[in-house]
Amino acid sequence: MATQILPPGEFIREELEARGWSQATFARILGRPLQTINQIINGKKAITAQTAKEIAAAFGTSPDVWMNLEMTWQLHSTPEPDGRILDRVRQVA
């Protein structure tokens, strides 16, 4: 059975619900515009290292958690490279 990969915003959404915080409250805590928080939660904006540190401070977690979730999501959602790359490597070798 394949593991389902979720965007990090889903985990933020769940954490906000568990704490009873709105996106607006979270934006105010982080000192970020509501639009930015909404874009992160909806997977339209990536979590940067700085944002990961801020989220971690607010939730009492490690920034590594948020960076790992972001990187896993990006790797999962990015198309595979052109299959002809190996052919071109062989041509050069």
Task: Give the predicted meaning of each segment.
Residues 62-91:
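Short amphipathic recognition helices of helix-turn-helix/homeodomain-type DNA-binding modules
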Residues 13, 24, 53:
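Residues within the helices of the helix-turn-helix
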